[in-house]
UniProtKB/Swiss-Prot annotation:
It comes from Homo sapiens. Forms homooligomers. Forms heterooligomers with SCUBE2. Forms heterooligomers with SCUBE3. This is Signal peptide, CUB and EGF-like domain-containing protein 1. InterPro entries: cEGF, CUB_dom, EGF-like_Ca-bd_dom, EGF-like_dom, EGF-type_Asp/Asn_hydroxyl_site, EGF_Ca-bd_CS, EGF_dom, Growth_fac_rcpt_cys_sf. N-glycosylated. GO terms for molecular function: calcium ion binding; identical protein binding. It is a peripheral membrane protein. Keywords: Calcium, Cell membrane, Disulfide bond, EGF-like domain, Glycoprotein, Membrane, Repeat, Secreted, Signal. Residues 1-23 form the signal peptide. It holds the Pfam family EGF_CA. Residues 33-73, 74-116, 117-153, 166-202, 206-241, 245-280, 282-322, 323-361, 362-402 form the EGF-like domain. Glycans are attached at N370, N466, N679, N750, N779, N789.
Length: 988
């Protein structure tokens, strides 16, 4: 790779970091090392240290000695007269070391090198009778007026005014006065002083108190001249040596500046200088207005750091906390995600139940008292259906079985769908009229399914309404004939599958003519799919193409039977009529002149792509515009196409689904019920729980003693079983049955043995006194029997997505607790010339298990292969590291002990040319010194962006400079910038 290419790639590089338990290297297997040092077989010098090595040993001279280890000699630190071992007075060499001493009148400073003046006057006034005056390196005694100092230089003698002897106050000697034989006086000086030419004054020399110099002294004609040791400066007094910033930073904690009077200390932002003028004390910014932090303020040395409560993240201003919208992440919830301040909640679609915190599994309703079915129960995805044995068919309530030939007098005759056509201006338009039982299911923006009517009794299962039957049963007018079925596929060019109200005014139409004269249309399904198809020619734009798949079910009109045309004849005639109708429909659909009429509104099945619609027109069928969003009409309402708004269901109808175009007639024909009924139980007139009747409607009678019924509108009651009775009639639950023992949660009552039985593995029971256990949702199971809650149900599947550039591994049932005795193995094999970077945002493995649950990453399955990472503990701080091998074999195992949340570990593969840079970043402790940096490795959006750029550096240009600043803290960007700049330096 050329220098320019490397620079270009690295200038756009963003990277991550590491902390954690990483495996170290190991020696060669099979070799036994001999420790010569401990056995004393080495030949190191007595002043050397023996250090064992894998194959031999080596000798190192001790500190203070020089040589190659087998011969060592003392280093004379004092031999350099200029530096003098750093001693300002005298340097004394000792074997392997040295020490500093000071002249009389001085003492050694704490640094062991400098010499400070001793104030002798502090100790018994220096022995002076009257006045003691301290001086650098010495002191002198003085007397009060009228006295003079005696020869011992400590006591004072009263002066006389007579004569010229030494007792006279005017004898003129500076130090010592001696009387001469002739009666005169002679002056003398104390040791270390020379008598001046006037024979009275005394001149100081370097021999007394080091000449008054703190460090070095040199005698000159004018007296001692002072000097200072290296790195010290002479004070303006000409005697004292002051520290400079070159010596121990001038004694300053932080910043040192040399001045004429000595060093001046200062402190950086976040510290304040203490009264000693040298020490810096940290300022606790959190004491004032919480440091400006929204949530938490944590004081640090010289600064502070803001933190946020769980569920919030710190913005790049490093003060403000913002709620984390977990619902914006991929794979947060299986079905529905609802964000809330600091948290989120996962919900499941109807017929599913939540497990493992975020996952949705199908509820096996049949495991709960047989789904309340009278006979058989068949579980389906998101629902279930009751089935009946031969000779019986399902009641309108979808639970009870009634005789096939038995009519329900209160049930309405199923309204018929109708296919018809009309002409306007020579153009033929066709219509599908759905008077009732319309189901609209939008699969996607450009796909939907519309069904109209009710399948025949011998056809496939009843029309499903979000997993439940339509609630219709046989009526006295329903024909038991086998329906005629036909499937056709139509193609519409330049059209999209948008089911929208048809508002365009059409010319006056001729009367609509039915397409099927000799039959009844009982059920029609229309499935519309749109896709783009590229035209011939590279520059030709792609065109929208829609396909409509129609399935028809028709029944013959038995009332038209005659001697000349019996049942077979009528059926053949109906089939011919259906074929002709399909031909007519094909022409109509091809011209985009096909409409569906529901609840008085005509809808275009597919239309030409138009300009972007605004307002209500931008929403699909079954949706209305609220707060600039398209929202589906809720249960209890239907979409009124002409009004463009949601309309409540009329009394006598109900709607238990969202986004529908009509309401379903109630099974009762009395028109009772609530307006806006959300399910069939709100239709009115049904028997209440604990009661039943032949058709499920009033008048009703109470369930006899020994039976119960928990649901409304039923035709019978369930027996308690095992000869158990109830205290009274009209009971609604098995809990009303007088069982001989009261079972606790995790158990069910066996009516044969009259004992409580623990729920088997794979089931649970959260309530008291039940006669069944609930099967775990989906493909989950429990770790043990007797489970009391759905949270004990765990998915056994090992999660993850392994890609060449990015991917992740996930413990089973994450983020719920993983199951017992789980074993997962993943293999990461990156493309050539790429290396692996792994981030563990957090990992939860119970340490109480004595490492029974382990995650290990190695080169291969062999226990002796190179290990990159291994842990059996919980770490809530992020961990990141590069793989020690090009490929990774990863294993997770759990035992039967405690369980934990587990882990979700993302990884990225990067160009091996960046290996040095990545290693430099991930091994820098500053990456983890800040909680803000740690949160980056936990933020799924930021990790995704970082991995995107690491895997594909050119993708950096997707993120603007402003976006990068808004995504990452300044300190993080600064850290990366310095690393990248240093790495690029050789290429400049």
């Amino acid at each position: 790779m050329g220098a320019a290419a490397v620079r270009w790639h690295l200038c756009v590089l963003l990277a991550l970091g590491t902390r954690g338990r990483l495996a170290g290297g190991s020696g060669l297997p099979g070799s036994v090392d001999v420790d010569e040092c401990s056995e004393g077989t080495d030949d190191c010098h007595i002043d050397a240290i023996c250090q064992n090595t894998p194959k031999s040993y080596k000798c190192l001279c001790k500190p203070g000695y020089k040589g190659e280890g087998k011969q060592c000699e003392d280093i004379d630190e004092c031999e350099n007269d200029y530096y003098n071992g750093g001693c300002v007075h005298e340097c004394i060499n000792i074997p392997g070391n040295y020490r500093c001493t000071c002249f009389d009148g001085f003492m050694l400073a704490h640094d062991g090198h400098n010499c400070l003046d001793v104030d002798e006057c502090q100790d018994n006034n220096g022995g002076c009778q009257q006045i003691c005056v301290n001086a650098m390196g010495s002191y002198e005694c003085q007397c009060h007026s009228g006295f003079f100092l005696s020869d011992n230089q400590h006591t004072c003698i009263h002066r006389s005014n007579e004569g010229m002897n030494c007792m006279n106050k005017d004898h003129g000697c500076a130090h010592i006065c001696r009387e001469t034989p002739k009666g005169g006086v002679a002056c003398d000086c104390r040791p270390g002083f020379d008598l001046a030419q006037n024979q009275k004054d005394c001149t100081l020399t370097c021999n007394y108190g080091n000449g008054g110099c703190q460090h070095s002294c040199e005698d000159t004609d004018t007296g001692p001249t002072c000097g200072c040791h290296q790195k010290y400066a002479l004070h303006s007094d000409g005697r004292t040596c002051i520290e400079t910033c070159a010596v121990n930073n001038g004694g300053c904690d932080r910043t040192c500046k040399d001045t004429a009077t000595g060093v001046r200390c200062s402190c950086p932002v976040g510290f304040t200088l203490q009264p000693d003028g040298k020490t810096c004390k940290d300022i606790n910014e959190c004491l004032v207005n919480n440091g400006g932090c929204d949530h938490f303020c944590r004081n640090t040395v010289g600064s502070f750091e803001c933190g946020c409560r769980k569920g919030y993240k710190l913005l790049t201003d490093e003060r403000t906390c913002q709620d984390i919208d977990e619902c914006s992440f991929e794979r947060t919830c299986d079905h529905i995600c609802i964000n809330s301040p600091g948290s989120f909640q996962c919900l499941c679609h109807r017929g599913y139940i939540l497990y493992g915190t975020t996952h949705c599994g199908d509820v096996d309703e049949c495991s709960m008292s047989n789904g309340s079915c009278d006979q058989g129960c068949v579980n389906t995805k998101g629902s279930y259906e009751c089935v009946c044995p031969p000779g019986r068919r399902l009641h309108w309530n979808g639970k009870d079985c009634v005789e096939t030939g038995k009519c329900l007098s209160r049930a309405k005759t199923s309204p018929r769908a109708q296919l018809s056509c009309s002409k306007a201006g020579g153009v033929e338009s066709c219509f599908l009229s759905c008077p009732a039982h319309t189901l609209f299911v939008p699969d996607s923006e450009n796909s939907y399914v519309l069904s109209c009517g009710v399948p025949g009794p011998q056809g496939k299962a009843l029309q499903k309404r979000n997993g439940t039957s339509s609630g219709l049963g046989p009526s006295c007018s329903d024909a038991p004939t086998t329906p005629i079925k036909q499937k056709a596929r139509f193609k519409i060019r330049d059209a999209k599958c948008h089911l929208r109200p048809h508002s365009q005014a059409r010319a006056k139409e001729t009367a609509r003519q039915p397409l099927l004269d000799h039959c009844h249309v009982t059920f029609v399904t229309l499935k519309c799919d749109s896709s783009k198809k590229r035209r011939r020619g590279r520059k030709s734009p792609s065109k929208e193409v829609s396909h409509i798949t129609a399935e028809f079910e028709i029944e013959t009109k038995m009332e038209e039977a005659s001697d000349t045309c019996e049942a077979d004849c009528l059926r053949k005639r109906a089939e011919q009529s259906l074929q002709a109708a399909i031909k007519t429909l094909r022409k109509s659909i091809g011209r985009q002149q096909f409409y569906v009429q529901v609840s008085g509104t005509e809808y275009e099945v597919a239309q030409r792509p138009a300009k972007a619609l605004e307002g209500q027109g931008a929403c699909g069928a079954g949706q209305v515009l609220q707060d600039s969003k398209c929202v589906a009409c809720g249960p209890g309402t239907h979409f009124g196409g002409e009004l463009g708004q949601c309309v409540s269901c009329m009394p006598g109808t109900y709607q238990d689904m969202e986004g529908q175009l009509s309401c379903t007639p109630c099974p009762s024909s009395d028109g009772l019920g609530l307006p806006g009924a959300r399910n069939v139980s709100e239709c009115g007139g049904q028997c209440s729980p604990g009661f039943f009747s032949a058709d499920g409607f009033k008048p009703c009678q109470a369930c006899p003693v020994g039976t119960y019924q928990p649901e409304p509108g039923r035709t019978g009651c369930f027996p308690c079983g095992g000869g158990l009775l109830t205290k009274h009639e009209g009971t609604t639950s098995f809990q009303d049955c007088e069982a001989k023992v009261h079972c606790s949660p995790g158990h069910h009552y066996n009516t044969t043995t009259h004992r409580c039985i623990r729920c088997p593995v794979g089931t649970y029971q959260p309530e008291f006194g039940q006669n069944h256990c609930i099967t775990c949702p989906g493909n989950t199971s429990t770790d043990f029997d007797g489970s009391t809650n759905v949270t004990h149900c765990k998915n056994q599947h090992c999660g993850g997505e392994l890609g060449d550039y990015t991917g992740y591994i996930e413990s089973p049932n994450y983020p719920g607790d993983y199951p017992a005795n789980a074993e997962c193995v993943w293999h990461i094999a990156p493309p050539p010339k790429r290396r692996i970077l792994i981030v563990v945002p957090e990992i939860f493995l119970p340490i109480e298990d004595e490492c029974g649950d382990v995650l290990v990453m190695r080169k291969s399955a062999s226990p002796t292969s190179i290990t990159t990472y291994e842990t059996c503990q919980t770490y809530e701080r992020p961990i990141a590291f590069t793989s020690r091998s090009r490929k990774l074999w990863i294993q997770f195992k759990s035992n039967e002990g405690n369980s934990g949340k587990g882990f979700q570990v993302p990884y990225v593969t990067y160009d091996e040319d960046y290996q040095q840079l990545i290693e430099d970043i991930v091994r820098d402790g500053r990456l983890y010194a800040s909680e803000n940096h740690q949160e980056i490795l936990k933020d799924k959006k930021l990790i995704k962006a970082l991995f995107d750029v690491l895997a594909h550096p050119q993708n950096y240009f997707k993120y603007t400079a402003q976006e990068s600043k808004e995504m990452f803290p300044r300190s993080f960007i600064k850290l990366l910038r310095s690393k990248v700049s240093r790495f690029l330096r050789p290429y400049k």
